[in-house]
Amino acid sequence: MAIMYGLGKKGYKVQPFKIGPDYIDPSYHNAITKKSSKNLDVWLMGKKGIFESFITATKDSDFAVLEGVMGLFDGLSGKNNYASTAHLSAILNTPIILVVDARKAARSLAAITLGFIKFDKKIKIKGIIINQIASDRHLKYILEAFESKIKVPIIGKIFSNRDHKLQERHLGLIPTRELETTSINNIVANAKNISQNIDIEKVIEIGNSEIKNELDIKDKEIHNIKESNLNKIKISIALDKSFNFYYKDNIEIIQKKAKIEFFSPIDSNTIPYDSNGIIIGGGFPEIIADALEKNYAIKKNILKLAQNNMPIYAECGGLMYLTNSISKYKNNKKKYKMVGLFDAETIMTGKLTLGYTEAILNSSKTILGNIKTVHGHEFHYSKIINNNKDIKMAYTLRRGKGIIEGRDGFSLNNCIASYMHTHFINSNISNNFIESCYKYMKK
């Protein structure tokens, strides 16, 4: 974020990206750059999807800054670089600025850094930022070790500072939508302070590299709907403090082919008028479960629409919201009543479910139509219990845990609700969902 801020301060238009499936980090990029950050994930989007998103987003920008995911070489498995920051860098031909953590290390830090540089010669590490420096003496030892061993220039030296620590929760950072204006201003102030310890001119020099362009961008057509009818379809999307896990690309893909209107399961009384479909994304319904419980009107409205076969697509937090209840961690006796479309309960646990998923659709007769496989990811601390055994499951997982025993996606009427998060750029999920909404509209 400091690099994004520093480039912006020099007058450059910065397009931020987050490598990997994370929903929260991009909201911090937005606060710094005032531009919508986009995710780049090879597993979710495919190579073509990466180029499509990247090239489209950077058309009017001077610089693209990509925040990595986990360690440089961490991806789908330990066998290769697939889906890692290094892999993404190789696809787009982007240089890497390596940030190394100096806590409890000095000369050893040089050995670790040298290992990163030599681990994969195809990866272009062009600059190093040393983070979490304890003191001037600590820095002196580090520089002495780097001097004879590391040829890549050090372009940033950042000292430890408790004031720079960001607020966290069980799934990581707290989404900026939940933060007060003061907290967001502090994030920007911290980025400003840290940027002063980075050689932004050197960043500019490193960043002036040519990006590969292997793409002829073409929108996927919806063959079964006349273009004149597309703007008649309205899809309502849940968006508030409880539900805000959406990829920017997904929203834009829907917007190209249908009208969208946002609503709040916390504050809205009904789904927007003339809606033909509903999307309820992920988020933190457990945090504000009491407010969701108290909005009886919207819950009743959603349940009635679902029972009348309105297409509804829900992921993770949306799945939890559509069950009978949500119980918080260490207080499972208190059940907050939710929509109750699916006869099951959600409880929060202390155990993290995290990883990429691969799913096969069990039927072509759902709102997602005839899709062979779906790539996604799951990231949650909740668990579905006491589910009615008669509930149909939309997906069988080749990879991942899902709701129960390698199956995911509760399916009822025209609704699918899964733990799996998906990206629309590399699949026909959005087109098939819009077609389902069109059929509903015509009834």
Predicted features along the sequence, with ranges:
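Internal gly/pro-rich beta-alpha loop/helix module
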Residues: A106-K226
